[in-house]
Regions:
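Short, Lys/Arg-rich, polar N-terminal cytosolic tail immediately upstream
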Residues: 1-6, 64
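Alpha-helical transmembrane segments in multi-pass membrane proteins
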Residues: 6-60, 109, 117
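Residue-level signature of transmembrane alpha-helical entry/exit and packing/kink sites
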Residues: 8-16, 38-43, 74, 78, ...
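Aromatic-anchored segments of alpha-helical transmembrane domains
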Residues: 18-28, 87-96, 157-166, 211-220
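Juxtamembrane helix-loop-helix connectors linking adjacent transmembrane helices
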Residues: 31-37, 62-127, 177-178
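Juxtamembrane/disordered regions of integral membrane proteins
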Residues: 55-58, 63, 102-103, 166, ...
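A cytosolic-side transmembrane-helix exit/cap motif
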Residues: 56-67, 197, 201
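Transmembrane helix-loop-helix hairpins at the membrane interface
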Residues: 115-222
């Protein structure tokens, strides 16, 4: 009896599973500063294995294999699209705060220039690493095999959620009703980013939307 051949998508999902295990162990046993998580740990755990896999297993060009656009004109256009979506996210957050607390305001106090700069850099770094793994690598391959934007985006969003389970349930700042809100928001953000990436054939907008969302969340906890 012949062994069933492992498809390229199954191989990619196997790599994702290994990454999830390594990341879960890291988040459980290593309590290092956030800057180390975002600028060192995630690039090594999330991105490096993907790059090695694309080069050594798929034997493809890295940027095109991740839907990363090198065109500056397209980047500028996609930046403004992302900024618009980010503004909608901010206005939605302000509206939810007003409806709940009857006040207009989202942030306890606005950070100084250095603090804000670090928040922005961290948000961009997070957006790059998480979107490369979840959208550029996993979703792209799911979509290429199924040709169904909705089912592949939904499945990739579930995987994206599992990637956040270690931090969602380990954070002292997120609990109770807020935990549920973050879980739902993660899934919705992932669905939106996935459909945008498939429609535009570019990872730039998802990265920037993810970054804008992270900035709003970070400012909310100050």
């Amino acid at each position: 009896m012949k062994d069933k051949k492992v498809t390229p998508t199954q191989k990619a999902l196997n790599l994702w599973a290994v990454i999830l295990i390594v990341w879960s162990v890291y988040r459980t046993y290593f309590k290092l500063p956030e800057w180390f998580d975002e600028f060192v740990a995630k690039p090594v755990v999330f991105v490096l294995p993907v790059l090695v896999y694309i080069k050594s297993v798929e034997k493809k060009e890295i940027l095109s294999s991740l839907f990363i656009n090198k065109n500056l004109k397209s980047f500028i256009k996609e930046f403004f699209i992302s900024f618009g979506v980010g503004l909608i996210l901010l206005l939605t957050a302000l509206l939810s705060v007003y409806l709940r607390f009857k006040k207009v305001g989202l942030f306890g106090h606005f950070p100084n220039f250095n603090q804000f700069g670090l928040i922005v850099l961290t948000a961009v770094a997070t957006g790059i690493t998480e979107e490369i793994l979840s959208r550029g690598f996993i979703l792209k391959r799911l979509y290429e095999e199924s040709k169904n934007a909705y089912s592949s985006t939904f499945f990739a969003s579930i995987l994206f959620f599992f990637l956040h389970v270690p931090i969602l349930f380990a954070s002292n700042k997120i609990n109770g009703q807020m935990l549920l809100v973050f879980m739902v928001t993660d899934l919705l953000l992932s669905m939106v980013n996935g459909l945008i990436m498939i429609q535009r054939k570019s990872l730039t907008v998802p990265i920037l939307i993810h970054a804008f969302y992270n900035i709003v969340v970070a400012l909310s906890f100050i």
